[in-house]
UniProtKB/Swiss-Prot annotation:
Residues 1-21 form the signal peptide. This is Outer-membrane lipoprotein carrier protein. It comes from the Bacteria. GO terms for biological process: lipoprotein localization to outer membrane; lipoprotein transport. It is found in: Periplasm. Its main location: periplasm. The gene is lolA. Keywords: Chaperone, Periplasm, Protein transport, Signal, Transport. Belongs to the LolA family. CDD domains: LolA. One of its GO terms (cellular component) is outer membrane-bounded periplasmic space. Coiled coil: none annotated. Participates in the translocation of lipoproteins from the inner membrane to the outer membrane. Only forms a complex with a lipoprotein if the residue after the N-terminal Cys is not an aspartate (The Asp acts as a targeting signal to indicate that the lipoprotein should stay in the inner membrane).
Amino acid sequence: MRAIRMLLVSALAMGAVSAHADEKDVARLTQLLEKSQTITARFSQLTLDASGTSLQEANGEMAVKRPGLFYWHTDAPQEQVVVSDGQKVTLWDPDLEQATIKKLDVRLSQTPALLLSGDVSKISQSFDISSKEQGEVTDFTLKPKTKDTLFDSLRVSFRKGLINDMQLVDSVGQRTNILFNGVKANEAIPASKFKFDVPKGADVIQE
């Protein structure tokens, strides 16, 4: 579940592809991200090594809400829950009956999930951004400006203005693809979704 800790595509018919200047890319990406104050979806995740060999598959559900709230529940093949209440992140492993709790790192380069739930107004300070459009899909490629990051590049794709998929590539070429399905934006999400009560008797690790 390495990629879940980090976080925190259909082939398209050939069409016109356009590239844009960086400032326009930043403005467009910021607009698309900020347009969705809440998002809920199912996701499927595939992790590949540098040669393209499948390392891991997973699926589950997610919910995010600005500012800084997210819920990521992997239900198969190995259950895991990651919850942020905007101040701290709790990682729950039911198999180990163990909760790991740490302060939320608000740097986008360290917590990619905050692209969907955090403050992206200064996103250009963290990344060099480029974009490509093809039909109803817009792809943004983000490359961190510093070396102290969990990934070398991050691609974020939108279809008809809604998040469609993400791909993270790390320093050894390992790729994690996350495809979102049944995406709903700007619907009410209960506050309880972003609170995690550690089960009685569980091990708790504070980092």
